[in-house]
Regions:
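Metal-dependent nuclease catalytic cores that hydrolyze phosphodiester bonds in DNA/RNA
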Residues: 1-135, 142-153, 286
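Metal-dependent nuclease catalytic regions and adjoining charged, substrate-binding loops involved
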Residues: 22-25, 158, 170, 174-286
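Structured loops at beta-to-helix junctions and adjacent beta-edge loops in soluble globular domains
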Residues: 68-69, 139, 185, 253
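Short, well-structured alpha-helical interface segments that form or flank functional binding sites
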Residues: 91, 95, 124, 163-170, ...
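A structural signal for short, well-ordered beta-strand segments and their strand-loop junctions
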Residues: 130, 134-138, 179-184
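A short acidic, glycine-rich active-site loop
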Residues: 153-165
């Protein structure tokens, strides 16, 4: 285990299952309040107005942020279940904080910060918690992300398209605290773990945040962050090109790639073929 609090929570859960531990009304009331606030935020908040950088989006690909600022009308709407997914994340955070409290883990609850980049450049955000003097974030993850992405800091760095690392570093800098890590909860199994990020080069990350801020503030021309990749089947190229995983999650992929066709795989032999974002289909595959 990467953090002493992991053992505390696991020990509490084991005792609770054995009938040897319980949760106080004060803690259940706090969890209920947090869930209620999440429902109010998700359903009753006013739509965001003009684009601005926030700690929650500053680490996303710059090409995506460029569209958010300059071409928001071409955004593909999120499906209705996206709201449910956001709610699940809020509920997981509220319950996990309740478990920390029930386990006797002391922490400072969420707070607002302003990251000062100098020259009157600021980005606002809200961190999840401060534990042992370090800023931590709570993430709910799919089973795949839990097992393949949130393995350690290095694996996350290789595919951080949602900007979790800049987000955490920005929170820590804005709060004038050290970088902690992520409490990651598997939405499929209930497993949880701590992914330590204390070894991150914060100055390098902050420089990247500043570069992103300047790129958008100076109205730089659009530039893709990723290129299409060759499709392979049994290690052989098919002649088709498809989007990267990062582009596949982007709400502007159809605007960015006019030839995009999101269709079942043209080469898979499976009964239920995976859906692929093709941007070029070879004639022989058409």
């Amino acid at each position: 285990m990467e953090h002493p609090a992991e053992l505390s929570v696991y020990s509490f859960l084991a005792k609770a299952m054995a009938g040897e531990a319980s949760v106080s009304k004060e803690i259940t009331d706090q969890v209920a309040t947090d869930v209620g606030n999440a429902l109010d935020k998700q359903f009753n908040s006013k739509p965001r107005g003009e684009f601005r950088l926030r700690m929650s989006n500053v680490g996303r690909p710059r090409c995506q942020l460029w569209f958010e600022k300059n071409d928001p009308e071409d955004k593909t709407p999120f499906p209705p279940h996206f709201l449910m997914n956001m709610l699940l994340g809020d509920i997981v955070e509220a319950v996990f904080k309740g478990l920390l409290r029930a386990s006797g883990v002391q922490f400072e609850d969420n707070g607002n910060i302003t990251l000062d980049l100098g020259d009157n450049k600021t980005i606002k955000g809200e961190y999840d918690l401060i534990l042992d003097g370090k800023v931590d974030d709570i993430k709910s993850a799919s089973p795949w992300s839990y097992n393949n992405k949130f393995v350690n800091l290095e694996t996350l760095k290789q595919g951080d398209s949602f900007g979790y690392i800049p987000q955490l570093v920005g929170y820590a800098k804005g709060a004038d605290k050290d970088v902690g890590g992520w409490w990651v909860v598997n939405k499929g199994t209930g497993q949880f773990k701590y992914v330590n990020a204390s070894s991150i080069d914060s100055e390098e990350v902050l420089n990247d945040i500043t570069d992103t801020y300047n790129y958008l503030e100076n109205d730089e021309p659009f530039e893709r962050c990723y290129e299409a990749v060759n499709e392979t089947f049994y290690k052989a190229r098919t002649g088709n090109k498809k989007l990267t995983i990062e582009c596949g999650f982007c709400s502007y992929k159809h605007k960015c790639w006019p030839t995009l066709q999101t269709i079942p795989s043209l080469v898979s032999k499976a009964k239920e073929k995976p859906i692929v974002d093709y941007v070029h289909i070879a004639k022989e595959a058409a």
